[in-house]
Amino acid sequence: MAATGWRVKRGRKMLAAVVLQVLGRGLVAAARLDKRVRFEVASWPDPYTVTLMIAPWGPGVSWRRKGDTLACLGSTNVDCDLLVTFKSVDVALPTLLGAKGVLDALAEHRVMVKGDLTVAMVLVRCLNIVEGYLFPDIVTRRILPRPATRKRGHLVAYGALIHTEALIQVKARPTEETAA
């Protein structure tokens, strides 16, 4: 069978589903660890649901901001206020695996956005911070617009992946020095 057969496509979708679930919990973990993410998510309307998925019929992940909490809903089908869709699994994998940045994918029209574009840009900023926590420095130097600034280590971020909810109470906009 050719390298583009249905088995290969199914394997890519399964890999993308696993990475999306880690990314979903990674956003919640970053909201627990980093004031910048908490501030950005607190700027979303209340209540607000965001879904990141792969078209057509691909895997996805959803987050809901309700009150002072951000929750990862996993791959459940929910009515969302913002839908960010990768055009195919082949287009999504380089971004999800760290070969390309989220900003590059957006600039190269690899994703479609349905909903409020300002919230989509907030999501992109948050995902850049999440990638800074989850990917090693050698990868983040290549895909992030500026070097990742982490206030906690990789192991702490990986440990925070077990949580599916985070409190997002923020009083003021954090600066780079006080981002922890």
Task: Name each region found by the language model.
Residues M1-A180:
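Feature captures hydrophobic
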